[in-house]
């Protein structure tokens, strides 16, 4: 069944109507999905999408004018001069037209408002681009000068959205298989203003399953034996989750199912070709998968390349254009597309973009919707949305079923694969992804592809230009090319009032916020580039003529920046571009929110089974999508105005907005203080205010005259909240009237959001409390939290639980007559319970997440990933599976725990086991599999104590001296130190570790003194050897004999050291029989050898004396080598003195770790006797025969 048959089956009535319209050449509705340009030769724009009934359609738009504008000094400038410039550069153009427009930068008075421009028309984009580059280099200002995507300019000029219904008129029509082809001119396209009918575009959701014979690894398309063995697809209407058809293409026999059609292929090559064939039959408008841009598409493309069929596959999938392989790889295989996830994070996508089908990776969409999600798997996102989960089928079982070719089990694999595809569509529909992106495209005159793959800034730019170029906004000429020097620096910071830290249990605190501060400032003060006045002389001249100006000044990069903006004084004709656009967006959103409210009320009254419920639900979703798109643009507006890479960037405007925000918050602050209110905290756009005590006098007196029960106290708190709400409502109205008088407009307003009571401020942007919005609500389980670490991404359940316990306990209503425990007491009580009662914590409480960003200097993650890389390499050497230690994709989050390492000390009692986080991190799966112990103390010290310190750092004992600049940091550090000592006092294991360290230090001090005595004796003996010139050999032998006597057998030394350790460890109250005691003995003996190495270094430095000694020995050895191929024997002739000396040398040099010296000379001896030395095994055998068994053998010297 192909697409046309599905459409006819599902939509027979609409299909008949569309057929009749086609036969009579009547106007048709068309929904564009994908856009492609023909940029060579005559410019042509292709739009792909569907007709009203779901037929696949291609709309070819011809005769699109190709032009750009260039500003000239005066209208009298002869066009011949511009023609001569272009001709001199061999730039071919069609014609020139003169017009007038308003430049976007700088204020121009009424009589000089418009400037002359010349519009230059071309036959091709190539010549246009050459001309733009040339004239910009010559210093001319250009407009309508898009150089990357010309279709955006076409959309703006024609006011033709690329993501909503378009009416086709006066078209020429040609059916072509599954595709209905139309040819039109720009005049034949009419934007359809109504919502239009239900969209019947088709979505194909798919999933692939891959196999590798190397167990435990992720299949790699570059490995010949790794294959894709199954591809499952489901198609849907774009708005529905009910499948229209399903197909499973497999290389292993699969039991038939009524839920899908099975296609059995004999090879991977045939499977890929079948996928392309099925793709072409359904001709989807959108192709979607989960993480397919990171895995599925790269796998399919790479395997198609290996089989030499990528060109054939592309041309099967593309119903419109057939291309050669090099063109496919260059223009249609998007190998690295950076997709913005959040302000800090981007992700690389790869996909095959066939004309007419838009690829969408559902994982990328979900990550944009949940930028702080700690888990980004399909299962996690389904759980977040409350959708049915995916099927649980481990990979090792799937691969086993594929290897055994069990048809019933392969049916389970097919079902698993099909359901994964189904869940992709479920997520797209649940999140209203396509309608939301379409509304953004309608507002910004960009394509659906732009709305999915580009950040918000360029869409705001495009929307601004679309508003600017039309008559109702003054025909402002806008360029898309950023000009001028781009400076980097900080704009004026926000006005901040330091919080009054601590727990407030007596008076409610109310938040007063500016509504959309920066957009409101732009509307109030007429911040817009074409309203900017740069010089004081011009500003004075304008004010003398009666103009009202808003002055801005601020410091930027150590200089004063100043300027003026001509105010609109509420006169529409005087409003700048930015305020006009924002006011239009605001009015539209207000109307939509009102409609949304009415639709929501209707939804509440109608049951899901009602015939009109689905239509109502659809309408509600569409209106919601429109108001969301408007909100996105309003919130992104200032970001683009302050972006120094934007063509609209103006430094005085960007800094002027923030400095005006400072001014207005200070204004409100002073107004509120003068009214007798108190300020708890203020930052950027909000103030937290307390009412005067007199407001509560009456209700407080009533409580004091009551029996003061807890019920009476709760009633008192209830009435205080109500009084605060009423007072704040009045204050808010007074503040807004005060602001209106100050700035002359009603755009800048504050709103009362909530009353917080009780409330606790712990730092800047860090506070929590019980929020009362419409009515009092003292539920401690629903806290209002801002900036506290428990809501921080990556935090463990342990930290969240402890933090929540502290906050909930501190929010309980307590009468003044009762004991009100201070925060420090609450923190210590909760912390003690957490530390002492360790059994209450489960493994899951310690799981945390982090992001792998190779370019970021996150030392712990870098160390951890380095360790995992080393593990993978080690396992690969032994042919073992290493997938459990796989490195995440850059930007991807991964889960881990901190595990406990054995406590170790050096000889001086210092901890030698690594305390670095990166050395203690382990993947969750690995820690679970090996049952590794969790380092609970690490979590307490490194995560929990910092959080707990935040609650108590306002205590007097933690406050810094007056000369400390960063008082909050100082207090936080002191509070954390205090809690660390508290934990050490209650944690038994920590005390044990400290005790072990003390014992080590005591033992070291005693034993080291004994070692030094012995070393002194050895040093004196060898000094005698160096100074004895008459008989150095005899002196050396005597020194060696003494050393052998002292170190005769490692056991004696160990035994001696053990006795010393036991004696002093026992006296210090520690058992030497434990592992730590044994480790201490090993460490002490190692230190002994280390001290002796100093003598070895002295010997090495006396190299000449050693060389003479060894030369004497060598010259007295008759070293004969027979032909070992025949005799298989090596003969030595030693005197008894020489053998004894060799034995002594062997033991002495080994003990002194001087093998490197002996090895150097003895190896030289071997090399001098034979150009081709015997094999190592042969030498070892010969020496053992002649010298007997020496442990360690003399072979160690030679080899």
Swiss-Prot record:
Protein name (database record): DNA polymerase beta
SUPFAM superfamilies found in the cross-reference section: DNA/RNA polymerases, Ribonuclease H-like
Family: Belongs to the DNA polymerase type-B family.
Domain of life of the source: Viruses
Alphabetized Pfam families for the sequence: DNA_pol_B (PF00136), DNA_pol_B_exo1 (PF03104)
InterPro entries to which the protein is assigned, alphabetical: DNA-dir_DNA_pol_B (IPR006172), DNA-dir_DNA_pol_B_CS (IPR017964), DNA-dir_DNA_pol_B_exonuc (IPR006133), DNA-dir_DNA_pol_B_multi_dom (IPR006134), DNA/RNA_pol_sf (IPR043502), DNA_pol_B_thumb (IPR042087), DNA_pol_palm_dom_sf (IPR023211), DNA_pol_type-B (IPR050240)
Organism in which the protein naturally occurs: African swine fever virus (isolate Warthog/Namibia/Wart80/1980)
EC number of this enzyme: 2.7.7.7
Molecular function per GO: DNA binding; DNA-directed DNA polymerase activity; nucleotide binding
Expression induction or repression: Expressed in the early phase of the viral replicative cycle.
Keywords for this protein: DNA replication, DNA-binding, DNA-directed DNA polymerase, Early protein, Nucleotidyltransferase, Transferase, Viral DNA replication
């Amino acid at each position: 069944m192909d697409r046309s048959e599905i459409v006819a089956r599902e939509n027979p009535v609409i299909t008949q109507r569309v057929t009749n319209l086609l036969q009579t050449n009547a106007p048709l509705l068309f929904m564009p999905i994908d856009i492609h340009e023909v940029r060579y030769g005559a410019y042509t724009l292709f739009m792909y999408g569907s007709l009203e009934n779901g037929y696949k359609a291609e709309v070819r738009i011809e005769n699109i004018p190709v032009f750009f504008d260039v500003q000239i000094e005066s209208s009298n400038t002869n066009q011949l001069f511009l023609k001569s410039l272009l001709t001199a550069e061999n730039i071919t153009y069609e014609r020139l037209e003169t017009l007038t427009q308003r430049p976007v930068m700088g204020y121009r008075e009424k009589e000089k408002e418009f400037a002359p421009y010349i519009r230059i028309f071309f036959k091709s984009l190539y010549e246009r681009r050459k001309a733009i580059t040339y004239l910009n280099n010559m210093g001319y200002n250009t407009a309508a000068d898009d150089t990357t995507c010309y279709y955006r300019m076409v959309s703006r000029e024609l006011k033709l959205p690329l993501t909503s219904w378009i009416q086709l008129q006066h078209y020429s029509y040609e059916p072509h298989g599954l595709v209905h082809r139309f040819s039109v001119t720009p005049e034949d396209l009419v934007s359809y203003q109504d919502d239009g009918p239900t969209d019947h575009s088709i979505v194909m959701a798919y999933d692939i399953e891959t196999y590798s014979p190397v167990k435990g690894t992720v299949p790699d398309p570059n490995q010949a034996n790794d294959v894709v063995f199954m591809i499952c697809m489901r198609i849907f209407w774009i708005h529905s989750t009910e499948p229209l058809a399903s197909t499973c293409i497999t290389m292993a026999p699969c039991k038939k199912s009524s839920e899908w059609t099975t296609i059995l292929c004999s090879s991977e090559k045939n499977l890929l070709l079948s996928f392309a064939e099925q793709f072409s039959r359904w001709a989807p408008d959108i192709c979607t998968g989960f993480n397919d841009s990171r895995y599925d598409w790269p796998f399919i493309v790479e395997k198609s390349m290996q089989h030499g069929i990528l060109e054939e596959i592309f041309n099967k999938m593309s119903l419109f254009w057939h291309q050669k392989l090099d063109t496919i790889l260059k223009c249609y295989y998007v190998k690295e597309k950076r997709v913005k996830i959040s302000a800090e994070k981007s992700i690389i996508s790869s996909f095959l973009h066939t004309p007419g089908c838009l690829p969408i990776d559902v994982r990328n969409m979900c990550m944009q919707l949940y930028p702080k999600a700690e888990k980004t798997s399909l299962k996690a996102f389904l759980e977040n949305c409350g959708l049915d989960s995916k099927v649980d089928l481990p990979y090792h079982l799937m691969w086993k079923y594929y290897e055994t070719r069990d048809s019933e089990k392969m049916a389970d694999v097919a079902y698993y694969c099909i359901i994964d595809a189904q869940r992709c569509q479920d997520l797209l529909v649940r999140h209203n992804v396509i309608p939301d992106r379409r509304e953004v495209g309608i507002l910004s005159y960009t394509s659906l592809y732009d709305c999915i793959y580009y950040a918000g800034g360029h869409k705001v730019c495009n929307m601004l230009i679309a508003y600017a170029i039309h008559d109702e906004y003054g025909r402002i000429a806008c360029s898309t090319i950023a000009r001028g020097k781009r400076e980097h620096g900080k704009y004026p910071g926000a006005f901040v009032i330091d919080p009054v830290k601590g727990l407030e249990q007596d008076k409610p605190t109310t938040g007063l916020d500016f509504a959309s501060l920066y957009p409101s400032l732009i509307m109030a003060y007429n911040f817009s580039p074409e309203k900017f006045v740069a010089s004081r002389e011009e500003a004075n001249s304008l004010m003398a003529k009666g103009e009202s100006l808003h002055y801005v000044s601020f410091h930027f990069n150590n200089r004063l920046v100043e300027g003026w903006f001509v105010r609109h004084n509420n006169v529409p004709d005087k409003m700048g571009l930015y305020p006009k656009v924002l006011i239009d967006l605001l009015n539209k959103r207000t109307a939509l929110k009102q409609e949304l409210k009415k639709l929501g009320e209707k939804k509440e009254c109608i049951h899901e089974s009602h015939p009109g419920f689905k239509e109502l639900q659809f309408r509600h979703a569409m209106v919601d999508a429109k108001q969301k798109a408007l909100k996105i643009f309003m919130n992104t507006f200032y970001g683009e105005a302050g972006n120094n890479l934007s063509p609209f960037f103006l430094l005085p405007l960007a800094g002027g907005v923030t400095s005006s925000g400072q001014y207005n918050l200070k204004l409100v602050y002073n107004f509120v203080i003068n009214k007798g209110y108190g300020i708890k905290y203020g930052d950027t756009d909000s103030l937290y205010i307390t009412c005067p005590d007199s407001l509560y006098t009456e209700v407080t007196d009533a409580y004091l005259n009551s029996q003061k029960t807890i019920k009476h106290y709760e009633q008192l708190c209830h009435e205080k909240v109500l009084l605060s709400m009423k007072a704040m409502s009045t204050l808010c109205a007074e503040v807004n009237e005060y602001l209106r008088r100050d700035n002359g407009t009603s755009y800048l307003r504050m709103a009362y959001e909530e009353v917080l009571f009780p409330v606790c401020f712990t730092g800047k942007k860090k506070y929590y409390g019980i929020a009362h919005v419409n009515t009092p609500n003292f539920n401690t389980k629903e806290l209002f939290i801002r900036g506290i670490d428990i809501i921080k991404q990556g935090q463990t359940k342990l930290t969240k639980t402890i933090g929540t316990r502290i906050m909930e306990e501190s929010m309980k209503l307590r009468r003044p007559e009762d004991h009100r425990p201070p925060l420090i007491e609450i923190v210590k009580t909760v912390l003690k319970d957490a530390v002492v009662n360790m059994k209450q914590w489960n493994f899951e409480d310690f799981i945390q997440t982090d992001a792998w960003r190779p370019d970021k200097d996150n030392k712990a993650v870098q160390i951890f990933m380095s360790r995992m890389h080393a593990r993978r390499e080690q396992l690969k050497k032994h042919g073992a599976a290493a997938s459990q230690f796989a490195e995440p994709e850059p930007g991807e989050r991964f889960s881990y725990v901190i595990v406990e390492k054995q406590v170790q000390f050096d000889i001086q009692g210092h901890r030698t086991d690594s305390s670095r986080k990166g050395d203690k991190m382990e993947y969750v799966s690995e820690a679970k599999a090996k049952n590794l112990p969790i380092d609970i103390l690490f979590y307490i010290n490194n995560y929990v104590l910092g959080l707990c310190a935040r609650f108590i750092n306002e205590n007097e004992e933690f406050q810094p001296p007056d000369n400390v600049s960063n008082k909050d940091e100082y207090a936080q550090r002191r509070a954390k130190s205090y809690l660390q000592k508290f934990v050490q006092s209650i944690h038994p294991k920590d005390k044990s570790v400290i005790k072990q360290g003390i014992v080590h230090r005591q033992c070291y001090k005693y034993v080291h003194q004994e070692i030094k005595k012995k070393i002194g004796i050895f040093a004196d003996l060898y000094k005698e050897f160096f100074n004895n010139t008459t008989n150095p050999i005899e002196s050396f032998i005597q020194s060696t004999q003494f050393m052998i006597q002292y170190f005769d057998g490692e056991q004696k030394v160990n035994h001696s050291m053990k006795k010393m350790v036991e004696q002093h460890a026992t006296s210090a109250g520690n058992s030497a029989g434990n592992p730590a005691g044994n480790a201490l003995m090993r460490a002490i003996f190692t230190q002994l050898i280390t001290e002796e190495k100093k003598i070895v270094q002295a010997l090495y430095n006396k190299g000449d004396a050693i060389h003479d000694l060894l030369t004497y020995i060598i010259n007295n050895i008759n070293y004969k080598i027979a032909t070992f191929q025949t005799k298989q024997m090596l003969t030595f002739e030693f005197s008894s003195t020489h053998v004894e000396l060799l034995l002594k040398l062997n033991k002495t040099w080994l003990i002194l770790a001087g093998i490197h010296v002996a090895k150097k000379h003895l190896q030289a001896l071997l090399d001098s006797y034979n150009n081709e030395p015997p094999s190592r095994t042969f030498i070892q055998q010969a020496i053992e025969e002649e010298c007997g068994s020496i442990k360690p053998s003399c072979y160690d010297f030679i080899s």
